[in-house]
From Swiss-Prot:
Record localization: Cytoplasm
Protein name (Swiss-Prot/TrEMBL): Urease accessory protein UreF
Known function: Required for maturation of urease via the functional incorporation of the urease nickel metallocenter.
Main location, first listed in the record: cytoplasm
Gene this chain is encoded by: ureF
Organism, as annotated: Staphylococcus carnosus (strain TM300)
InterPro entries the UniProt entry points to: UreF (IPR002639), UreF_sf (IPR038277)
Amino acid sequence: MIDHQALRLFQFCDSQFPTGAFSHSFGLETYIQRGTVHDEESFKEWLRLFLSEQLTYADGLAIRLVYEALNQNDPEKILHLDRMLFVQNMPRETRTGTKQMGTRMVKLANELYDSEWIQWYEAQYNEKNAKLHPAICFTMLGHFLGIDIEMIIDYYLYQNVSALTQNAVRAIPLGQTAGQRVVTDMITFMKTTRDHIFELAESEFGITAPGLEINQMEHENVNVRIFIS
């Protein structure tokens, strides 16, 4: 039997969902211009790195911690995580792009659902107490819909894999079938990533690979671009 609450959250995983994810490569375009990422296999290698580093220690761990804070009714913890996600995101384009995506997701979520936490989160933004991050909004929505934390993380990872793969299809370019092979091949790795997130200590929050951040910073200087970040 279909879990319609899960489908409601899965709607936000659509690569065409209007948060602006289709405009961001999060440094992938820099790797493509250098020739480091140039085909299906090299893209999968980059995608594994992105999931196992930035998405694990930033967004993924934040989702777990925000979910715990929601259960404990701890708004200060959520605001702290919001600030940490923003200030630890060193590349300017990526930091700004993530904030824009978070703002759009929060506004859309508030249009579609009556979640007190998401309404509170947007109010904190209006009062300049929060930056708005898509991982936090996604967690709040999943929590509101009664989705378990494992599925919330799985869906968030899938959302990122799907969006980045569609961007790679355009930018490398890859065929649509090759793109779907990448997503299929990444499903097992997504489970491994999720399991790792549950093993992390909170003190590990924000760890990332310098190479990813450097290439995200250098994206500002690429000669020709089709992505904002």
